[in-house]
A protein has these predicted regions:
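Active-/binding-site microenvironments in catalytic and ligand-binding cores
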Residues: 1-193
Length: 193
């Protein structure tokens, strides 16, 4: 677990350390949308497409936005919209998906961002880039970096607004429910421009 705590501190009684209630007041700040689907010229990325650290940098450059320490970075792949439009959810939760490549773990660490969020069910590309590890990106970014993740974000309206005015930064607020000893929570994220 993050900050040197043993994973055995999470059991049927919940998280004895690092519970979600501890970060409730911290989930607000500068948000940045990286619309990688629009940057790549596609409506949505196909399942299994890995978005690299270089892709994130190039997308930010094309949007004329700089990722700064403490930012909440929100990555749009278009997958949520594609599933909504097709009215097809089979395999969405737990199945193959576009997502962040393993090399983005180092990018996250170097940028010192507060959180990473996507419109996919797990942020990380599926199938994974490695055959010998299940969800290797998660095994690095959660316990080693301590990153907070947001998943299954609906980004169509935000992406449209950002594309229209070419402003990809905003005030972002997404406090979790104060569920004592929980390791995650539903949220109602808001981007305020």
């Amino acid at each position: 677990m993050w900050n040197g705590y043993d994973a055995r501190l999470v059991d049927s009684d919940g998280a004895q350390k690092n519970g979600i209630e501890k970060v409730r007041a911290e989930m607000a700040g500068r948000g940045v949308l990286l619309d990688v689907a629009r940057w790549a010229g596609v409506d949505f990325f196909e399942d299994g497409i890995a978005i690299s650290a270089n892709d994130l940098d190039e997308c930010a450059k094309s949007q004329n936005v700089e990722i700064k320490q403490g930012d909440f970075v929100i990555v749009r792949t278009g997958q949520m919209e594609q599933r909504l439009d097709a009215e097809e959810w089979g395999g969405y939760a737990g199945g193959d998906a576009p997502g962040l490549a393993f090399d983005t773990a180092e990018w996250i660490y170097n940028k010192e961002i507060a959180a990473i969020c996507t419109d996919t069910w797990g942020c990380e590309v599926r199938p994974n880039e490695t055959k010998d590890a299940q969800q290797p990106w998660h095994w690095v970014v959660i316990p080693m970096i301590g990153i907070t993740m947001g998943e299954i974000f609906y980004l169509r309206d935000l992406a449209k607004d950002c594309d229209e005015d070419k402003v990809y930064e905003f005030f972002f607020c997404a406090p979790p429910l104060p569920i004592t000893k929980a390791v995650g929570s539903p949220i109602n994220p808001m981007a305020i421009k």
